[in-house]
Each structure stands twice: as structure tokens, then as C-alpha cells.
From Swiss-Prot:
SMART domains: Aamy. The record marks D652 as: Transition state stabilizer. It catalyses: Hydrolysis of (1->6)-alpha-D-glucosidic linkages in pullulan, amylopectin and glycogen, and in the alpha- and beta-limit dextrins of amylopectin and glycogen. The gene is pulA. GO terms for molecular function: carbohydrate binding; pullulanase activity. Keywords: Glycosidase, Hydrolase, Signal. NCBIfam families: pulA_typeI. Its EC number is 3.2.1.41. Belongs to the glycosyl hydrolase 13 family. It is an enzyme of class 3 (hydrolase). This is Pullulanase. It holds the Pfam family CBM_48. GO terms for biological process: carbohydrate metabolic process.
Length: 843
């Protein structure tokens, strides 16, 4: 018996080891341009594995051919046709090939989503047709057509022809015979036509459905969308002007596959479908089912306020039931201006996720409600760490609902993610909740976290990721309700990839703009959020950002708004550093960052704090809050100091400690000591916390946080990303130094001047020298109790003597200590330690 079992095991292992899957892929491009195009293929079933690139090695009468051999028996693989190293995708969506008996042969047509298992017709077709307005349709064709031949063109609505007025080239620089055409109709498409089958027919071409794009802008709806709850009834509203019909499916349980009730929704105009369901639906789950563009789609609500685990279903909730005790009296810290904020960036799991945090609810929302937690050597951890440090605001990496990962799995070592793959923007992420299946629990726990932080005077800034979503098509509630409309696409129907994440949201579309404004105002009103950081803010159009600012500051003028003034590589910037002046929206100051730490792209390049050469002018620009200080060299992008976020590190790229360590290792002229690296760390903190503008600290920067040199730890385990409180104990002097600097800034308004005029009046640069920046804040700047304050940064690797202005000066910050207590009193000159900062004052 044992022999038979052994033989069976050998046979099974042999089958796995020696089996092979062969896939033949035929690819046809209508433009005949194959250079650079290749395949990315990955195993899906029965086992999922990483992908690999495969080249086309042959050709036939259809086009190019690739023969792909995989050393395992597969039944399904994923496939992407891509240009070079992800320069572009032929089709935006991931596609899949079904395999039988270890073999598959497929045909792929340029720009066509369907994968063919038999050789398809390659005759001309309409790639994509889109309605730009009620009279204008633009279409991209596989082959050129003569626009002078209007008689070739026909547009039908449910089979009924609409007269064509004229046909012209869509690109005015093109010639008349072109594959990009504009069709102008004699009659306008009506609102009811949007829900019908509109088809473009060109003689000699395969016809195409017309996708409604900018035409939908005319059907803006300014009312409340989603599930509008009351104990007596719930009103369901969804915006889908292109759907023939919409139903709401009601479920008693999140795992149910069959609804207990199906309710037909009624079209109310302006693209909105509505259904009223009587009774108390608190805790009921729901989905929408819609038919548009010839497909029946089932989706969660893009306006979901609550969901079941892993966003399987939306949920109706009585939000009043989710409020912790005393919620009506909860308030965040009130500040006069952004400049009063000291921002500290954290991730929910990072700050309490490791064993040595001493927190019970490790890595969860409730972990940040636990008080008086201790770590190694009795150092404070979690919430208590934030309170001891003294920061005014925490910037929390995404904690809205994101797609990646299983919310029921709390093993952050096995699975971890920053959360920059949005799915449902108005719902808290379930992975940080004690019970993701209960739609009320995650909401209540976020509120408890916010309340606990507010209790200690700490505001909550939410990291929002509007420029892209995790996926498109079936992986996007936007695309399910109104395909294509919410995204930027090109003339061929391909999703633009300005974000570098596979798609980019069209913030300029009125209903997308409404969604963004609705989302941030909802978080403020329901969760008492105190600010927002906008990921890839440069991809959001200026009008939308201004509407966000107006809406939020109407609620609370102290809400802090800032973001990344860039997008993906090479993307056009719509709201960059040059756009923030006068908007009450701040931008991350990458010039100041690089001056302090050196290039984020080349770890060996030293910044000012490591003795880097030629950084003095850029440091000065940062010191003055990036305003136009002198109209010459000391000027930058800001009209007001509130518009610059001054930072040296954040979750992206290397931590400050890791960056400086790598720069030290690359230094062929010098052996760096740990003490010198600590000095660089402290000098960076001193520059940030004594400069005008808004200081921003990467969580753990205050105790030399390391991620073991991982410069993109978005999915690294918690052992890499977590706050290691052993390091806080090890570098407690660096922590105390930052704590003292924060106390100094909070108690002295001279470091928090509120406008450019005050800065130019009260801030005077003093003689410096190579790698020295010195300035005076004079005449009780900002109403400061100290008459004059001198700040000196020494970026030299050796001690330096500096001549002080006349008088006796009280030192409150030197290379070892920082705070508001006098360390010593000096006159005439002061000896500056290497890589150090000094703050001195006189009455």
C-alpha cells in the first residue's frame, strides 16, 4: 500500500514538474506599427504567479506571432499587450485566455477588447465613437476615410436615422482623408436618446456604439446621491444617464447571493434614477443593477457610505448609531492659520502594528485610542507618543476603502498596503476595524479614533487619492454606472495613464467634480476631519481644487488643504506649484526637500544637512516660506507662507535616516559616524521647524526611523514599515531634540508669520558663508515675546566660529539640546558644532 501511495505521489509531482502550457498569440495592428509591442503574461489558474514579458518572434498573414511556453499545466492566464516597458497598453483592461489541455491559440486585434479563439475579420472598423455634445460625435477609425463623402456616414438611435449635417476632420491640422473624424448632426440628441442604442455606421467599416462623454455634462445633478436614510424610508439615488433601466437589489446579509427584494428605480431626469423603499433599512445591504451599452452590470454604489467586508455590497446605515458618546461636542484643534500646524505623517498600521508598541489593538483604528501605552524602556508609544512629541496634526495615509487585500486578514506581516488604490471613497477601510463585516463598526471606530486624537489637541488630516482608482470596468463603480465618463480617455477610447496607476480621473467633468466636493465635505461633517492631503494633486484641475477649498472653508476656515503638485511621469500638470498662489491650498515643497536631504532619486547625493555644496540659496527660499522675498534669488512659488509644506521625508522614497546613511556609505572621502548621522537628522528637523510655512515630519523622523533602505515600501511587511520603538529608546536624544523644537515653534509666533509682508518686515538674512545660513527674526516678529531671534544652520563638517550681532544672546537650541530654556548666554561670537543648528534670542 505504501509503495502504491509513493508511486502515486511521484506521478503527481512529475505531472506538475514536467507539464507544459503552450499559448500561440496572433496580434494584428491596423497601423502596421509593431516596433516595441510585446506581451505581458501571468498564470492565473490553478495558481496565480507573477508575470513576465514575451516578445513576438514570428509573423503570418494576420500579423505578429508569439509562441509562449509556460512550464506548468495552466487553465487560465492573464495577458496585456503593451508598448516597451509599460509606455502604453493596447487595451486598458486586463484580459484572460482560457486554456484547454495545455494549449491555446488566440487572435488579438489592435484596440479591441475581445480575445478571439478563431481568426477574426481584419477589415476596417470604428475603434471608438464618442458624443462630445448633443450634435457632435467624434470617431477614431482603423483606416482613413474621406471626410468629403458625407454619404458614407449614418447615425441611428434605436435604429432610427438622425440626419448628418456635415463630416469634418476632428484635428484641424489633419488632411481631409483621415482616421479621426467629427460628425455634426442636423438634429440634437435628446435626453431620452442617451439611454438608447446610438450607433455610428460608416460604409465599409464595422459599426460602433456611440459612447456618451462630454454630452453628459449638460445633465448635471446637484442633489444628494446614494442611500439617503431615515427611520421611515430610504431613498436610493444613482446618476446613470446612459442606462436603459436601473434596479436596486436588497439583501439581508452581506454574504447572500440572492436579494430578498428587487426594486425598479424610476428615471427622474438629469441622469438620476430613484427608488423609495419604505421602512427602517438600517443594516440592509444593497447593489445596483443597470443596463447600459448593451451590458447588464451589477455594482456597489459609488456613493456608498458603508459596506460589507471587502466591499462586496453597499450598506444602508443609520449614521446616528455610529456616533461615540459625546460626539456632538467633539472638535479638532483651532488654529489661526496653516502656519500654526505641525504635521506628522503616519499609517494606521505603522504606528501601533509592531509587538513592542504595547498597544492591544495593534494596527487598528482603536489602537490610536489607547492611552498611556509604553514600549521598550518605558518610552511612550502610539497615541501617547504623538501627545508627548507635541505635534498639532497627524496626516494619516489612506484609510478610506481601498481594493487590495482581504479586510478579514489582520496579519500585517503577510499583507500590508499603503492604500493608494481607491475603491469607495466615502467608506472607511475595513482592514483597520475589529469587525469589517459589520458596516456600523468601522464607522464608529474611525470616529472613536478621531475623538481620541481631538481630546489631546491633535487634528486629523486625511490622505485622499482622487486622481485614479484601483481599476476600471468591472473594478470601478464609476465605470459600472457610467462607463468611461469619469475617466480621461484619448480619441481611441484608451484610458489615459497620467497617474502611472493605469487610469486618471476626469476631475474637470461636472459630476466628477461634484463627487470630489461631496466626498470631502462628507468626511468633514460626518467624521470631523480637520484637513486633506491630495495625492497627485497636480492631476486635479484648478477649478475643482478651488471649489473644494470654497466648500470646506465655508464649513471651517481652519481646515488644512495641501497636496502633491505633480502627477505621474510626463503627465500634464493642471494644479502645480505655480497655481497655488492665493488659493489657500498648499503644495509639497520638493525644492526645499532636495536642498535639505539631497536628491530623492540618487541616494548618494548629499543635501545641506550632510555638507552638500551649493544649497544655501534654496535653503533660504525655504526659510522665507517660498515667497518672493527679494525679487531676485530669494523667491519661489508662494504668495503666502501657508502655501508651502516644508518637509525632508515622507512615506515615499527613503526615510531621512536611510537616505543619509546611503549618502554616507557612498562618500569616498570620509568615514561617517552614527553621531554625525544623528547630527544631520537633528539639523533637518531644526530647519523645518524654524522656517516659515507649514512644517511636515515623516512619522519616526524624530527617532531616526529606518525601513531597511526600502524606498518604496507600499506593500512591504509591517516588520519593515512599523514604528520600531526600540529605535525611539536608542535615539531618545534625537526624539527629545525634536520635541524641544516643536515646543519652541508652538510657543513663539516669530516662526509662524502669517503673510509675506510680515516675513519681509521681520526676517533679515545675516552674513553667512559657505554652508552657513543665518537670519534674524526681529522686532517681536508676529508679536513674539522675544525681541530678536537669531537662527543659524551650519552645514559644514567641521566646527565654525560665527560672529553674532551686537549684544548678549541667550542660546535655546544648540547641537545637543532644543527648547525654550536658556542653555547659555553668549556675546560676540559663537562656536558652531558640525552639522548643527542654533537658536538664540535677546530680550
Amino acid at each position: 500500500m505504501k509503495t502504491k501511495l509513493w508511486l502515486l505521489l511521484v506521478l503527481l509531482l512529475s505531472a506538475l514538474i514536467f507539464s507544459e502550457t503552450t499559448i500561440v498569440v496572433h496580434y494584428h495592428r491596423y497601423d502596421g506599427k509593431y516596433d516595441g509591442w510585446n506581451l505581458w503574461i501571468w498564470p492565473v489558474e490553478p495558481v496565480s504567479q507573477e508575470g513576465k514579458a514575451y516578445q513576438f518572434t514570428g509573423e503570418d498573414d494576420f500579423g505578429k506571432v508569439a509562441v509562449v511556453k509556460l512550464p506548468m499545466d495552466l487553465t487560465k492566464v492573464g495577458i496585456i499587450v503593451r508598448l516597451n516597458e509599460w509606455q502604453a497598453k493596447d487595451v486598458a483592461k486586463d484580459r484572460f485566455i482560457e486554456i484547454k489541455d495545455g494549449k491555446a491559440e488566440v487572435w488579438i486585434l489592435q484596440g479591441v477588447e475581445e480575445i478571439f479563439y478563431e481568426k477574426p475579420d481584419t477589415s476596417p472598423r470604428i475603434f471608438f465613437a464618442q458624443a462630445r455634445s448633443n450634435k457632435v460625435i467624434e470617431a477614431f477609425l482603423t483606416n482613413p476615410v474621406d471626410t468629403k463623402k458625407k454619404e458614407l456616414f449614418k447615425v441611428t438611435v434605436d435604429g432610427k436615422e438622425i440626419p448628418v449635417s456635415r463630416v469634418e476632420k476632428a484635428d484641424p491640422t489633419d488632411i481631409d482623408v483621415t482616421n479621426y473624424v467629427r460628425i455634426v448632426l442636423s438634429e440634437s440628441l435628446k435626453e431620452e436618446d442617451l439611454r438608447k442604442d446610438v450607433e455610428l455606421i460608416i460604409e465599409g467599416y464595422k459599426p460602433a456604439r456611440v459612447i456618451m462623454m462630454e454630452i453628459l455634462d449638460d445633465y448635471y445633478y446637484d442633489g444628494e446621491l446614494g442611500a439617503v436614510y431615515s427611520p421611515e424610508k430610504t431613498i436610493f439615488r444613482v446618476w446613470s444617464p446612459v442606462s436603459k433601466w436601473v434596479k436596486v437589489l436588497l439583501f439581508k446579509n452581506g454574504e447572500d447571493t440572492e436579494p430578498y427584494q428587487v426594486v425598479n428605480m424610476e428615471y427622474k431626469g438629469n441622469g438620476v434614477w430613484e427608488a423609495v423603499v419604505e421602512g427602517d433599512l438600517d443594516g440592509v445591504f444593497y447593489l445596483y443593477q443597470l443596463e447600459n451599452y448593451g451590458k447588464i452590470r451589477t455594482t456597489v454604489d459609488p456613493y456608498s457610505k458603508a459596506v460589507y467586508a471587502n466591499s462586496k455590497k453597499s450598506a444602508v446605515v443609520n449614521l446616528a448609531r455610529t456616533n461615540p458618546e459625546g460626539w456632538e461636542n467633539d472638535r479638532g484643534p483651532k488654529i489661526e492659520g496653516y502656519e500654526d500646524a505641525i504635521i506628522y505623517e503616519i499609517h494606521i498600521a505603522d504606528i501601533t502594528g509592531l509587538e513592542n508598541s504595547g498597544v492591544k489593538n495593534k494596527g487598528l483604528y482603536l489602537g490610536l485610542t489607547e492611552e498611556n501605552t509604553k514600549g521598550p524602556g518605558g518610552v511612550t508609544t502610539g497615541l501617547s507618543h504623538l501627545v508627548e512629541l507635541g505635534v498639532t496634526h497627524v496626516h494619516i495615509l489612506p484609510f478610506f476603502d481601498f481594493y487590495t487585500g482581504d479586510e478579514l486578514d489582520k496579519d500585517f506581516e503577510k499583507y500590508y498596503n499603503w492604500g493608494y488604490d481607491p475603491y469607495l471613497f466615502m467608506v472607511p477601510e475595513g482592514r483597520y476595524s475589529t469587525d469589517p463585516k459589520n458596516p456600523h463598526t468601522r464607522i464608529r471606530e474611525v470616529k472613536e479614533m478621531v475623538k481620541a486624537l481631538h481630546k489631546h489637541g491633535i487634528g486629523v488630516i486625511m490622505d485622499m487619492v482622487f486622481p485614479h482608482t484601483y481599476g476600471i470596468g468591472e473594478l470601478s463603480a464609476f465605470d459600472q454606472t457610467v462607463p468611461y465618463y469619469f475617466y480621461r480617455i484619448d480619441k481611441t477610447g484608451a484610458y489615459l495613464n497620467e497617474s502611472g496607476c493605469g487610469n486618471v480621473i476626469a476631475s474637470e467633468r461636472p459630476m466628477m467634480r461634484k463627487f470630489i466636493v461631496d466626498t470631502v465635505t462628507y468626511w468633514v461633517k460626518e467624521y470631523h476631519i480637520d484637513g486633506f492631503r491630495f495625492d497627485q494633486m497636480g492631476l486635479i484641475d484648478k477649478k475643482t481644487m478651488l471649489e473644494v477649498e470654497r466648500a470646506l472653508h465655508k464649513i471651517d476656515p481652519t481646515i488644512i488643504l495641501y497636496g502633491e503638485p505633480w502627477g505621474g511621469w510626463g503627465a500634464p500638470i493642471r494644479f502645480g506649484k505655480s497655481d497655488v498662489a492665493g488659493t489657500h491650498v498648499a503644495a509639497f515643497n520638493d525644492e526645499f526637500r532636495d536642498a535639505i536631504r539631497g536628491s530623492v532619486f540618487n541616494p548618494s547625493v548629499k543635501g545641506f544637512v550632510m555638507g552638500g555644496y551649493g544649497k544655501e540659496t534654496k535653503i533660504k527660499r525655504g526659510v522665507v516660506g517660498s515667497i518672493n522675498y527679494d525679487g531676485k534669488l530669494i523667491k519661489s512659488f508662494a504668495l503666502d507662507p501657508e502655501e508651502t509644506i516644508n518637509y525632508a521625508a515622507c512615506h515615499d522614497n527613503h526615510t531621512l535616516w536611510d537616505k543619509n546613511y546611503l549618502a554616507a556609505k557612498a562618500d569616498k572621502k570620509k568615514e561617517w559616524t552614527e553621531e554625525e548621522l544623528k547630527n544631520a537628522q537633528k539639523l533637518a528637523g531644526a530647519i523645518l521647524l524654524t522656517s516659515q510655512g507649514v512644517p511636515f515630519l515623516h512619522g519616526g523622523q524624530d527617532f531616526c526611523r529606518t525601513k531597511n533602505f526600502n524606498d518604496n515600501s507600499y506593500n512591504a511587511p509591517i516588520s519593515i514599515n512599523g514604528f520600531d520603538y526600540e529605535r525611539k529608546l536608542q535615539f531618545i536624544d534625537v526624539f527629545n531634540y525634536h520635541k524641544g523644537l516643536i515646543k519652541l515653534r508652538k510657543e513663539h509666533p516669530a516662526f509662524r508669520l502669517k503673510n509675506a509682508e510680515e516675513i519681509k518686515k521681520h526676517l533679515e538674512f545675516l552674513p553667512g558663508g559657505r554652508r552657513i545660513v543665518a537670519f534674524m527674526l526681529k522686532d517681536h516678529a508676529g508679536g513674539d515675546p522675544w525681541k530678536d531671534i537669531v537662527v543659524i544652520y551650519n552645514g559644514n563638517l567641521e566646527k565654525t566660529t560665527y560672529k553674532l550681532p551686537e549684544g548678549k544672546w541667550n542660546v535655546v537650541v544648540n547641537s545637543q539640546k532644543a527648547g525654550t530654556e536658556v542653555i547659555e548666554t553668549v556675546e560676540g561670537t559663537i562656536e558652531l558644532d558640525p552639522l548643527s543648528a542654533y537658536v538664540l534670542y535677546r530680550e
